[in-house]
Amino acid sequence: MIRIEILFDRQSTKNLKSGTLQALQNEIEQRLKPHYPEIWLRIDQGSAPSVSVTGARNDKDKERILSLLEEIWQDDSWLPAA
């Protein structure tokens, strides 16, 4: 099972629109589950920002997942309306 953990520092989350973290979780699940049906995803606040991907079959899979996460983050179409 692939485990993805995305943590935002508390200061960063203060500036996010309401519903942003849930929208991010929904978008990640929608885009990754067709390729990786068994994923465990955690998006939360932490003391420091971080992204962790574990449980990938190999480095190529891990890099692909990280690349997809970066694409999702850069594409703002999933962000909730103001």
UniProtKB/Swiss-Prot annotation:
- Alphabetical GO biological process terms: DNA repair; SOS response
Pfam families referenced in this protein's UniProt entry, alphabetically = DinI
Indicate yes or no for the key word DNA damage: yes
- Protein's UniProt keywords contain Nucleotidyltransferase: no
Q: Which keywords appear in this protein's UniProt record, sorted alphabetically?
A: DNA damage, DNA repair, Plasmid
Highest taxon of the lineage? Bacteria
**Where does the secretion signal sit in this chain?**
none
* Family assignment from sequence similarity: Belongs to the DinI family.
Biological role:
The imp operon is involved in UV protection and mutation, however the ImpC protein is not essential for these functions.
Q: Which PANTHER family match?
A: DNA DAMAGE-INDUCIBLE PROTEIN I (PTHR36572:SF2), DNA DAMAGE-INDUCIBLE PROTEIN I-RELATED (PTHR36572)
Q: What is this protein called?
A: Protein ImpC
Which lineage do the record's taxonomy fields give for this organism? Bacteria, Pseudomonadati, Pseudomonadota, Gammaproteobacteria, Enterobacterales
